[in-house]
């Protein structure tokens, strides 16, 4: 997330090549159709409303995908936009974004299944970004990456936690 990495990168102290993790928004990947334009429009929001550039962040991706989910759910229940109707619609809607097809919320835990980019943080060699970008090791879809219901139940049981299946509600 740029809010955590920008100051380290600007000071020349970012540990490039030593940070590995999951990135939700591969903002640096211009080869994804529409990504460069989306990132540019996101940055323009900062210029328009805050008089400064807004660098890509996980929060930006979260806003995008959350609003997209709400809009797609509303299309399926346009006659009733009550909280109950929207909650039900969100639990069954499937949609696509720039970063993947068939995004949805799992019924048993309401976690969104979407693409996860496993990356090593590297310095941008193009000169476009002042913040770390990712060297993509693998891209996983939600169902490949997230624990199954059975795995979550087993983990909860082993650790004396209560697992609540939200699909049963």
Per-region residue spans from a language model:
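Extracellular/periplasmic periplasmic-binding protein-like sensory domains
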Residues: 1-65, 76, 132-167
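Residue-level signal for nonpolar/aromatic packing positions in well-ordered secondary structure
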Residues: 42, 66-70, 118
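Segments of small-molecule ligand-sensing domains
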Residues: 49-60, 71-140
